C-alpha cells in the first residue's frame, strides 16, 4: 500500500495547495478528511486476498529473502511514536509548572461570550512566550507570565483565539493528523498536509473572530503584541509558530485574500 498512499497523498497535497493559495482559511476539516483516508488505507492490507496459481514451465519458484522495508517502517514508527509520548509527558510537566488562573474575569467573560459550557482551565506558565492550548478531555489554555502586562483588549483577543480552538475541536483533529504522520512518517506529503492543517486552524480562528465583529486592525495589533515565535508540542496549538505573523496580518487586512504590495506595506506600518 506504500505506492498508492504516496500517489494519493501527493495528489491530495497538490489539490490542497491550490485551495490554500486561493483561501488560507479553507475549512481544516477537508484536510483532516484526507488524512483520515490515509489512516484507513493501511487497513486494506487486512482484507482477504485471492491468488490464482498458474501452472506452466516456469519451474520451481525460489523463496525470496524477507524484505527489510517492514523493519525500517517499524523503526520509524517507534521513533516518532516515542516522540509523541514524550510530548504528552511534557504537557503533564507544563501542568505542574504552571499556576491556575480560572478566576481571571476576562477568562470568564470570554467563556460566556463563546457559550462554552465544558470545563476549560486557564493556567499561567513562567517559561512560555506565547499562548498555547492543549488537552483533549480537559482543555487547558497556557498564557505566558508576561500576559499580566497585556492590555485588557490584547488579553481578550488571545483568550478568544485559544478558546476558538477548543470550540472548533481543533485539538482532536490535530491529534488525528499527528497519528497519521506517525504511521506515514516516510511520506513528506503527509507531513506537509499536517502543517497545512495547523496553518488552516490558525487562519480559521482569525477569520472567525473577524466575522464575529472583531475589528481586523485591533486584532492585528493584538497579534503583534502577543505572537512571539513559540515551540509547542505536536499535540497542542500555539497562537504563534505555525503561520508567519506577517502572512496572518496580510490575510486579515485583505479580507481573506492574498495580499498585494500595498497591503504588505500596510502590515509593516501596523506591526510597527
Language-model segment annotations:
Residues 1-272:
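Membrane-embedded and juxtamembrane structural elements of multi-pass membrane proteins
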